Amino acid sequence: MAKKTESTGCDTCHWSGFVITDSASYARAELCSCIEECPHCEGSGNILSENENGYSYVAPCHSCGVIRRNVKLYNIAGIPAKYSHVLQVDAGLELKRMNSSLQRALKYAKDEFVKKYPTKDGFLLMGPSGLGKTHLAVGTISELTLKHGVKCLFKDFF
């Protein structure tokens, strides 16, 4: 059964409209069945609209179009499968176990970069292994793609 407009989702997807799985190499977002059955666009993600001058145009479905676009953006970001559980910047990170530099990076990523995007140009995380840099990067990418519709690409240089 499909939900409408702002209340898109169900208990299966925790009202997000998508579920995350891990394929062989990459995390993968898939539309929840509550979205696939959208009554507004019949699953296409688009509706026919008309502007104030009477011209018809194709627009994203107000009920599921944004979710469909954001799922595609998440899937092309190339997030490693082992991070499929990380859907927000601070997911699973414990402040008390982090050094002060990583705490500042987390605060910057969450409070400055994600919330104020695109006014910030980006950031680079450097340091020894095991600090949580990849976790922080994946969380940032997940939030930007799934919640804000921003095109991102995960790149591991090593």
Role assignments for model-derived ranges:
Residues 92-123:
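Pre-Walker A (pre-P-loop) alpha-helix and adjacent loop at the N terminus of AAA/AAA+ ATPase modules
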Residues 54, 116-118, 145:
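Generic structural signal for beta-strand residues in well-ordered domains
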Residues 142-153:
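Post-Walker A helix-loop "phosphate-sensing" segment adjacent to the P-loop in P-loop NTPases
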Residues 154-158:
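A short hydrophobic beta-strand->loop->alpha-helix junction that borders the nucleotide-binding pocket
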Residues 119-137:
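Walker A/P-loop nucleotide-binding motif
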Residues 102, 106, 134-141:
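Hydrophobic, well-ordered secondary-structure segments
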Residues 84-86, 113, 147-148:
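Short, surface-exposed linear patches
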Residues 1-103:
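A short, basic N-terminal segment
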